[in-house]
């Protein structure tokens, strides 16, 4: 971890090509959480050098060279030298906007929302894939018990709605805490 004021950087080894985990063959994944205003900074970050704006996410190789140069400059100024070096050596860094989605309802008639369609929390809790898999198992359980009925979908909602909301709240809390925002010694017992 590296925690510059109001930001967060983390990194960890992952398997390399062919799922290789031998020393020297692994890759290194890193994430730098940086706040950006939605009205100006984010729009600029999601606009390529040809002026094309990608509102839902810019393709990795389309990130403007100006933003990459600026990122590397800021990294040298505020990050630990090891992380600044990683950013210097990354040939094609990419960026992704992070949004929170907290649904108030996940069942609509004969439609049930699951996974990221129902809730999207900041990556700090690491629940995206796990939550989607759990939701698939829960809805399968209720369909097996009650058939493909509105009652099965309601049972699914009863079990998963509050949990999904709690996951998003916890991710928001951890994100604020890790970025040293809103964590001035207060204890948020609802989201611990």
Which residues fall in each region the model found?
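Short secondary-structure junctions and interdomain/linker hinges
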Residues: 78-82, 105, 163, 174, ...
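Short, conserved, surface-exposed binding loops centered on an aromatic residue
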Residues: 19-23, 75-77, 83-88, 103-107
